């Protein structure tokens, strides 16, 4: 914003990536929540504004600046052969994100409480990528869950709690940005991590073979 203002351009920002901005949620002592459950209790009954519909028309400039073809960026190159596998499951864009939400609320949401933890069941919302990319907002998900909650859908409250888990993570990042590069608790600095990248244990971890086989 400062850079744009210096150029004589007005910049405005509007919240939408989170349900509640981190600085609007405080403990009684004026601090931030370091544990999830008290945060959930503090926000579960807060009003979440109903999202506005998309504008019918967005005026464009008389001329557009030169640009590049997105395909030329080779964004999937780093994934190598995995890109083709992921492409079969990705649903990109706001319209498909809304379809995914509708499918979830009319289906798997009813058994979400247990179904989301069972790998053999199609029990999750699959909305993580859409939320991360801004193709759907947490407010849209919240109100869809609220509508199902009003209908007596038993999984709706669990889904709202999961949305607040996402909020909790972002709130911690806002208040303690050092956790991106350092341990949450200094005592963990002495944890005996393995430094041998060629060890059998590290190889097993990279290939998802550290747990119990199904």
Model-derived features: positions:
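Acidic beta-strand-to-loop metal/phosphate-binding motif
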Residues: 1
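Aromatic-residue-lined binding/catalytic grooves and analogous aromatic/hydrophobic interfacial grooves
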Residues: 4-6, 11-12, 28-29, 131, ...
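Acidic carboxylate-rich catalytic motifs and surrounding loops in phosphoryl-/glycosyl-chemistry enzymes
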Residues: 13-20, 116
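Short alpha-helix plus adjacent loop in nuclease-associated cores
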Residues: 18-32
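Short His-Asn-centered micro-motif
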Residues: 14, 133, 207-208
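Short, structured secondary-structure boundary patches
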Residues: 6-9, 30-38, 195
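Glycine/tryptophan-enriched, flexible segments
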Residues: 31-187
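A contiguous catalytic/ligand-binding core that recognizes phosphate-bearing ligands
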Residues: 169-214
